[in-house]
Amino acid sequence: MSEKIYPVTKPVKARALIDKEKYLKWYEESVENPDKFWGKHGKRIDWFKPYTKVKNTSFTGKVSIKWFEDGQTNVSYNCIDRHLKTNGDQVAIIWEGDNPYIDKKVTYNELYEHVCRMANVLKKHGVKKGDRVTIYMPMIPEAAYAMLACARIGAVHSVVFGGFSPEALAGRIVDCESTFVITCDEGLRGGKPVPLKDNTDTAIHIAARQHVHVSKVLVVRRTGGKTGWAPGRDLWHHQEIATVKPECPPVKMKAEDPLFILYTSGSTGKPKGVLHTTGGYLVYAAMTHEYVFDYHDGDVYWCTADVGWVTGHSYIVYGPLANCATTLMFEGVPNFPDQGRFWEVIDKHKVNIFYTAPTAIRSLMGAGDDFVTRSSRSSLRLLGTVGEPINPEAWEWYYNVVGDKRCPVIDTWWQTETGGHMITPLPGAIDLKPGSATVPFFGIKPELVDNEGKVLEGAADGNLCITDSWPGQMRTVYGDHDRFIQTYFSTYKGKYFTGDGCRRDADGYYWITGRVDDVLNVSGHRLGTAEVESALVSHNLVSEAAVVGYPHPIKGQGIYCYVTLMAGHEGTDTLRQDLVKHVRAEIGPIAAPDKIQFAPGLPKTRSGKIMRRILRKIAEDDFGALGDTSTLADPAVVDDLIANRQNKATA
């Protein structure tokens, strides 16, 4: 583990919003007196009706989380209208297309008109407050307009990543009973079309079989590619917005009215609908965006995530726009036309703050320094990373080569469930250690506990819990509050359990060590092993499957599958390829297995439980100490798995 320390540099400290002294003072107040602290900082957004209650939360019993509950506000108003008087002509969104020669800029005045028109189209077709709208879009400005239009009229959006399959999309439509979908004829990624409208049509058929009927589909024209069309149901976005007014009053929303549902992987098969509400979420997204990235007026800020993930919600759309920032939306991929794309975009748009995932950093590091050094990158002031822990080697390369040793690397740990950054350095206050997410943000009380629930003090290695609520916290699992309590609050009573392992060093810095449950982190995206297993088992030749993660040089974690076939069938390379295709179709490319090992049997206890610990060790090519195997029903299975492992170290 790297123990190198990079102190805050003079230039960074000189312009920083928060220095060490202020961090310590604010942090102490935020945990000692959260009502006073958040009562003050809740005022960073505009309220139609000011709140008088700040925090009303309980992590025990029925678990209830409420912030600013008697206040009324509107997220779309805070992200657009309140900026118009003084900053209407400022650029809100810079859009950089998949094709490097195509881009556009959208000012706050233009954003207002686009969002109001889309909101009026939704209203015209019967969408009202509380209705769920599914958004299945590529990274184009209309995706942000759709989110903000829903927020404007009080509809609850559920954004589904454009890389997910029709089956995955259908499952999310069914779970929240969404009857209105916003999509696009086709997306573009790396020069290749993505059939979003065709996928949507397939998903709607699947949903209908489960008695959820989508009544309208609003289709944005992106490529002009051929798609199916259902008259009466399907609507062209460009035709619809021409028929409505360019203004739409924002609906007064209670702070605890739902804002969005975002599905995330759980350790059981069915994805969970993480529910975020209006007031607390926006306060937290905006505040973390400002202080973690040390955002100053006039900065150009670029987060490379997709709006289909929480990072896109909090740090492309809501946080930046609430702060009247200029946020860059990128439709493309890091290696198209070549591996220099990120650095060219930074030069082209004079980007000051750049936020990306360790997977992208590792892959670009592998492409060599020349792609980076042929660009100037002189506009860069701060680098951020998100999605998974960054290994010290990649951190050093990012700092030394991309940032020319002058930009702090802000390694942010947080989750879909947390709404915003939880453990992160503040650039002007915290010395950096490569590989460490460093220290908690204001109001966050981390605690390490062992497997028995004993609280660990000082330098320790354990399970990461948070002991008190913060405004950005998810409120429930949509439609299943018991699952919310069970998943997050039952393992360690009265504490929010993150599902991550963590080490705290002697300086009090936190190092995230990865998931401790059956959830994989592949390229910064969460995937439940159970989801991949059920996709494999749905293939007619597969009798049983077990999926584990293993260290992958680029993705962080790769997907290793043990597959037992139906009697009488042989495992072949053709079948292997077929299974990869099958999983891609069921879930999406993100879930494609890296290694498939055909196994006559899996290591099970006498009660029939699969011993995943053993499977993990074998997948990691580290089976010298498998631990206690005395409860195995058939120990010979293990020898066969070891002999046929797919991940043997090359001599």
Swiss-Prot record:
Acetylated. Deacetylation by the SIR2-homolog deacetylase activates the enzyme. Mg(2+) binds at V537, H539, V542. Pfam families: ACAS_N (PF16177), AMP-binding (PF00501), AMP-binding_C (PF13193). The keyword Lyase does not apply. ATP binds at G387, E388, P389, D411, T412, W413, W414, Q415, T416, D500, R515, R526. One of its GO terms (cellular component) is cytosol. Keywords: Acetylation, ATP-binding, Ligase, Magnesium, Metal-binding, Nucleotide-binding. It catalyses: acetate + ATP + CoA = acetyl-CoA + AMP + diphosphate. PROSITE patterns: AMP_BINDING. This is Acetyl-coenzyme A synthetase. It comes from Rhizobium leguminosarum bv. trifolii (strain WSM2304). The lineage of its organism: Bacteria, Pseudomonadati, Pseudomonadota, Alphaproteobacteria, Hyphomicrobiales.
